[in-house]
């Protein structure tokens, strides 16, 4: 089943990033992500209770018992929003390194090198392209996230906001990471999305296990490069290059 093929790529990606030839491309973004994680978690811990209170609906006294049922949903909602923010910021900062990591993983998997050799000059040259692509992802993400955020404040409707955020998050994990190998091959944004939709169930399987792994504090720092490697395996084995010739 396609949905079951997705999760295995993350596990294989984790094994791949342990190879000596790939460690440089893992350690640099890992260090940057650690700094982002520390800053964001410190801020989130200070504001967490306030955010939950802000999102919680105001219930009449006779329904006050429902707070014990509804409160965990809004705690989960805040955690999901914090997770999205960290993932978005960390991936923007690490984008050029993630692009190079994806290239090198593809070299290992295919057994041939069709990419320019690594150099700091080449890395600098990649920054405008990778940052442009990250901004395109942001433009895709923000309007949809804004709709979900508005729903989170609508009494009654906000009860379904958490599962909708989770489903959207799973899809975005597939978009975020599989885009690295797609962008390396100069596949256009709309073409990339169309290809992902054609592999929807496999994408949701990969995105789902990646989403869960990235929710675990500290473990998520290692799983981000593993997700890049796993997404590259996804691209190769699901024959992403076929999308280039359409």
From Swiss-Prot:
UniProt KW Cell membrane keyword: yes
Keyword list, A-Z: Amino-acid biosynthesis, Cell inner membrane, Cell membrane, Cysteine biosynthesis, Membrane, Sulfate transport, Transmembrane, Transmembrane helix, Transport
Record membrane topology: Multi-pass membrane protein
Bilayer-crossing regions: 24-44, 69-89, 148-168, 214-234
Main location: membrane
GO cellular component: plasma membrane
GO molecular function, one term: high-affinity sulfate:proton symporter activity
Cellular localization per UniProt: Cell inner membrane
GO biological process, one term: cysteine biosynthetic process
Signal sequence region: none
Disulfide bonds: none
Function: High affinity, high specificity proton-dependent sulfate transporter, which mediates sulfate uptake. Provides the sulfur source for the cysteine synthesis pathway.
Family to which the UniProt record says this protein belongs: Belongs to the CysZ family.
Protein's name according to its UniProt entry: Sulfate transporter CysZ
Organism of provenance: Pseudomonas aeruginosa (strain ATCC 15692 / DSM 22644 / CIP 104116 / JCM 14847 / LMG 12228 / 1C / PRS 101 / PAO1)
Gene: cysZ
